[in-house]
């Protein structure tokens, strides 16, 4: 699977002209390679016939269905990076308090 990589300028356009937090960019690159249409690697399998675990993680920040529904409402299936970033920011603020703290957690646990 190949992911699209976005430039800083493209990320700012996608996030409504607001510069994306550097820690958010770091997490996004590690979760999906920056692709707002990325499905979870394990859900898709490894490409060698191995079945995945059917995770509902999706999008640039790999949020699961229930989390996307909670923070995105009826737009939970949106591939709009701005909407995904906004929802992920709300999730991160509530769970960790900041993107920096979420990044530190990710580095320790390889998920957030």
Regions found by a protein language model. Give the residues of each.
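Extracellular/periplasmic catalytic domains that process cell-envelope and extracellular macromolecules
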Residues: 13, 18-21, 53-56
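N-terminal secretory leader/proregion of peptide precursors and effectors
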Residues: 1-17
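Generic structural signal for alpha-helix termini and adjacent loop/cap motifs
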Residues: 9, 17, 30, 94-95
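Active-site micro-motifs of SAM-dependent methyltransferase domains
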Residues: 13, 34, 70
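Short, functionally critical alpha-helical segments immediately adjacent to catalytic or ligand/cofactor-binding
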Residues: 20-45, 85-90, 103-107
